[in-house]
Amino acid sequence: MTTQVRKNVMDMFIDGARRGFTIATTNLLPNVVMAFVIIQALKITGLLDWVGHICEPVMALWGLPGEAATVLLAALMSMGGAVGVAASLATAGALTGHDVTVLLPAMYLMGNPVQNVGRCLGTAEVNAKYYPHIITVCVINALLSIWVMQLIV
């Protein structure tokens, strides 16, 4: 007969807070800091303006400035990174509050498929021939959400 130790509510709360803090500092924070550093490097070198100019015609189809493409590219790699890129671009004045609001659902619908392909799909033994289809669906969902958000906001 095993004895089960029961924790009180306060102990469970403190344990959950510790785990949450660990997740935030080891998983989320490095992505956000990396995104800020990359955007600052792109800005200092002038590449951010170049990317904005190159992507402007395509992003204009969704009513967004060209720099918004960097948020979507970051979302392919990391959701936390995409949030960091969006925050950095908003701070720099390249994106307005409206632009960030429109991009937010797209960042989450994109769902960092590059990480998921390795982590989730590989572990679940999904056939690799379906990876491009899965990533394409993520991108299409994200782009459609931008149009929907432009109508709503």
UniProtKB/Swiss-Prot annotation:
Residue intervals annotated with topology Periplasmic: 1-31
Bilayer topology: Multi-pass membrane protein
Pfam families xref list: Gate (PF07670)
Record topology, Cytoplasmic segments: 53-68, 111-132
Keyword Cell membrane attached: yes
GO cellular component assignments: plasma membrane
InterPro entries: Gate_dom, SpmB
Bilayer-crossing regions: 32-52, 69-89, 90-110, 133-153
The entry's keywords: Cell inner membrane, Cell membrane, Membrane, Transmembrane, Transmembrane helix
Cellular location(s): Cell inner membrane
Record family assignment: Belongs to the SpmB family.
Name under which the protein is recorded: Inner membrane protein YjiG
Source lineage: Bacteria, Pseudomonadati, Pseudomonadota, Gammaproteobacteria, Enterobacterales
Gene designation per UniProt: yjiG
